[in-house]
Amino acid sequence: MAGKLTLIVGPMYSGKTTELLSYVEIYRLGRKKTIVFKPSLDNRYGVDCVKTHAGVEVEAIAVEKSADAMKYIKQPVDAVFVDEVQFFDKDLVKIVRQLLDQDVDIFCAGLDMTFKQNPFETTMLLMSLANEIIKKKAVCHICGEYNATLTYKFVQDDSEIDIGGKEKYIAVCRDCYNKVASKND
């Protein structure tokens, strides 16, 4: 029986990593063999852990390229968890497909869109393979409603790959995004 891919997506501050780590906990409580990966590019909370904004953390292996992950995966493994998938190269998709065929469950979390509302390629490719897609939302930083599906970058830097947190980004609903974006055009 093939493994299954669960993909958790949404804007910043929507609880993607929190949900990912809850699945890690479930598998570990069930005495399943797990491994957690993150991109080495994301060192906001350290290099050897995945950490939520609330401070919950799990040990993780930071890899520069998707292919590097395979040398850490020793069979048998029951589940592989990947945070911040938007920062991985698209080779991750081949690796996920290979692991699914080996009956490994995969859980991935990440942004689905850039702050310019462009899709992240690796995330979109994983969506095409996913058995389940969980689309998260956040509280809009501007109007306070629980309807934010977009990330807005408020610093003057046009780079779409730019690691950061509250010093650069906020979660916003579409109405507030359009209002703020039109003021800054």
Swiss-Prot record:
Its EC number is 2.7.1.21. Pfam families: TK. GO terms for molecular function: ATP binding; thymidine kinase activity; zinc ion binding. ATP binds at G10, P11, M12, Y13, S14, G15, K16, T17, D83, E84, V85, Q86. Transmembrane segments: none annotated. GO terms for biological process: DNA biosynthetic process; thymidine metabolic process. Signal peptide: none annotated. It is an enzyme of class 2 (transferase). One of its GO terms (cellular component) is cytosol. Zn(2+) binds at C140, C143, C173, C176. It comes from the Bacteria. It catalyses: thymidine + ATP = dTMP + ADP + H(+). The active site is at E84 (proton acceptor). It is found in: Cytoplasm. Belongs to the thymidine kinase family. Homotetramer. This is Thymidine kinase.
